[in-house]
Amino acid sequence: MGSISYKDTETNLTAQQTQSIETTSTIITEEFRSEEKVLPNETPEKQYEFATSFLKVGDYNMAERAFKEFVDMNSNHKLAGNAQYWYAETFRIRQLYTDAASAYLEGYQKYPKSEKGPINLLKLGVSLVQIGEKDQGCLMITGIKKQYPEAKQSVLQKAKYEEKKFECKKEKS
């Protein structure tokens, strides 16, 4: 029968410690990288355009980071509501519906009068239904016409479609 000597145990322990240190180092490096700024030091309009460029090429992880950074840095800018909407879209596109719902809700609460307000509310409703919150989601979807009577016709039609698709009960006026 074989036996394990003290030297073998010590060598094995040293190898495990080295591996542990290397793993920890890698994790720290990755966390640090994710905190790096994405947007260029330009005007908010150029930053928004830059963030949008990631959507156009299908890099939704970078688009998420760029739009989040834009909203954090330019929360009072006229494009902030649009940026918040696109931030939410990066999650929806990747089927991360809980994150999408959270981001749409934040957009609806912070930027209700933005150009993207009506579609933001619609997508919030759809995302809520997709995560199992049908009653809440339907409430958002059926409330769009009341909340945004001047919304684009395409948004109102899409809301009607989603209302039927999810078999939402009509909101009583």
Where are these regions (language model features)?
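Short solvent-exposed coil/turn linkers within tandem alpha-helical repeat scaffolds
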Residues: M73-L79, K110-K116, K146-Q157
